[in-house]
Amino acid sequence: MRPSSPSGGRSSRTRVVALLACLAMLTACGQATQTALTGTPSATESAVTPGPDAPTSTSEVDVEREGMEPAVVTAVRYAAHQTYDRLVIDLEGDIPGYNVKWVDEFLQDGSGKPIDVRGGAYLQLTLFPAHAHDEDGRPTWKGGPIYPADLGNLTEVVRTGDFEGRVGIGVVLARQAAFQLREQEEPTQLILDVAH
């Protein structure tokens, strides 16, 4: 039989484990959640944790993924932060392949017709395989196709298409700036930060 401790039989190790469990619970309760209308700027900080580094690249990004079911775009949200603007693409399913590059103008997928928006720079994101509609053809990313943003650098978001397993998202900026992309799971999101 063990001798009893002054704390009513609990060992120091048990107290430490209990303290760590309480801290974990408090941390989980303290995380912010955000709900925003689809395609609208968010008044609060994103629930996505901030990136470890400021955006530093202006180079094209191309990530290919094959043999997967198409992801479904459920929302695109955006918010201004102190030194950058953040665009969050909410997805159902796994993160699809994607391409991000600077373009001279946005074109409608399928028709190739120019989309009339004005800005200083245009960043085109294309997700594949992906859809922005359900099995019955109803949009899952509602509104648009042009969503005003008026943030530090990001001025508009454009749905350039949802065609043949590809979803196009145009980011209209006041000026070309460094950007970074991050993938997040649980919830599944592709996150684009663009410097001011």
Q: Where do the language-model regions lie?
A:
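Bacterial N-terminal signal peptides that target proteins for export
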Residues: 2-18
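C-terminal motif of bacterial Sec signal peptides marking the signal peptidase cleavage site
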Residues: 25-28
